[in-house]
A protein has these predicted regions:
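Ligand-binding beta-strand-loop-alpha-helix segment within the catalytic cores
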Residues: 34-42
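Short, basic, glycine/proline-bearing loop/turn elements
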Residues: 42-55
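PIN/NYN-family metal-dependent endoribonuclease catalytic core
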Residues: 1-22
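Short, hinge-like loop/turn segments at secondary-structure boundaries
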Residues: 20-24, 94-97
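A metal-dependent, Asp-based hydrolase signature
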Residues: 26-32
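Acidic, PIN/NYN-like endoribonuclease modules and their adjacent C-terminal/linker elements
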Residues: 83-154
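Long, charge-dense, solvent-exposed interaction surfaces that engage phosphate-rich ligands
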Residues: 57-58, 145
């Protein structure tokens, strides 16, 4: 598995974060974006723009996501917005859309030890306030991943 995204996807993500979480300082969001790009080698997909006009999705504004997935050779688009990524449209490119909860559960079933290690590492990185794996699971549940959170608590 190799996470990939585009500058445009990050723009949308961080605009939504800024709008929905005004308590997070702009500088923190900027730093998080930089850390994400540094943490995942070769994460930025480019050269996908010419594919956009030929694609059909219920929401035309989501075509850039599919175009980037095609360009990256992705097998999965991880999104909570499943209705705008219909199986019939994605299947012709060998791509499927998965809800983040389903995706994390797939990872858990493939290598539960590593997923638990990632949860522990995330908790250990929290400083203010300090976190525990249970806290990370609480955040996952609150973010719409209740099945994964419950599995990781076991």
């Amino acid at each position: 598995m190799h996470a990939r995204w585009t500058g445009r996807i990050l723009d949308e993500t961080f605009e939504n974060l800024a709008e929905n979480r005004p308590d997070i300082p702009t500088g923190t969001l900027t730093k998080l974006r930089e850390l994400m790009n540094r943490a995942v080698p070769d994460c930025l997909v480019t050269g996908y723009e010419t594919l956009i006009p030929a694609l059909t999705l219920p929401d035309e504004d989501d075509r850039h996501v599919l175009a980037a997935a095609i360009r990256a050779g992705a097998q999965v688009i991880v999104t909570a917005n499943l209705r705008d990524f219909p199986d019939a449209e994605l299947a012709q490119f060998g791509i499927e859309a998965k809800h983040p909860d389903e995706f994390v559960m797939d990872l858990f079933h493939l290598d539960g030890v590593r997923v638990h290690q990632a949860i522990s590492a995330t908790a250990a990185a929290w400083r203010n306030p300090p976190g525990t794996p249970a806290d990370v699971c609480d955040r996952l549940a609150a973010a719409g991943l209740p099945i994964s959170a419950a599995a990781l608590r076991r």
